[in-house]
Swiss-Prot record:
Function of the protein: Efficient protease with alanine specificity but only little elastolytic activity.
Signal peptide: 1-2
Natural source organism: Macaca mulatta
Superkingdom of source: Eukaryota
Catalytic site: 60 (charge relay system), 110 (charge relay system), 204 (charge relay system)
Protein name: Chymotrypsin-like elastase family member 3B
GO CC list: extracellular space
Propeptide residue interval(s): 3-15
EC number: 3.4.21.70
Amino acid sequence: VASGYGPPSSHPSSRVVNGEDAVPYSWPWQVSLQYEKNGSFHHTCGGSLIAPDWVVTAGHCISSSLTYQVALGDYNLAVKEGPEQVIPINSGDLFVHPLWNRLCVACGNDIALIKLSRSAQLGDAVQLASLPPAGDILPNETPCYITGWGRLYTNGPLPDKLQRALLPVVDYEHCSKWNWWGSTVKKTMVCAGGDIRSGCNGDSGGPLNCPTDDGGWQVHGVTSFVSSFGCNTQRKPTVFTRVSAFIDWIEETIASH
């Protein structure tokens, strides 16, 4: 899986709930997963482009009864800006992790792969995400960014422009404490954020982007769930599927299709 580098200008300032508009095209592996309803397509989840014809998203984003397309190189979903690529998805090309159970989000395995019906054209606005090595665990407080078109606050509106928010990693030792997520969080997950900024509905499936030593970014998480008490509840960080726990499954799935 190729490595993803945003342009240097994409490193966000230190200042998605209580996030801010992203710099346009600064997260060029971010995709919008859209489903068809009454003849038009609607944003439902995020995702990350990990090969020219493969996207990783969350298992809970996929319903076998729906028709999907993926929009790449998008910034403002409401406006045609030029670099967008919209690629249809064939129904047989949705690969949800075999152990995903939508009745048990806390059981983990909330990850899916989507094969595009044609390869994306890579360029400034569309690039491949870099994935971490298998088993890689981020230290506490690693300054990662969630990106997505999720609700701006609990039950709030969906934004048109891609949002980003700084979510420091909360390590498993802290996140699994009884008054945090307790046993709901598993070692195959990553927690990030706290109470002020968080993921929200619509960010699901999108990336947790974490800095690398050489100035690039790696997608360490696939946005999975937030607290039912609200998107920015204290001691309930946003929870992500830990990508480094699923590298083997990702590579095997791509190789066999």
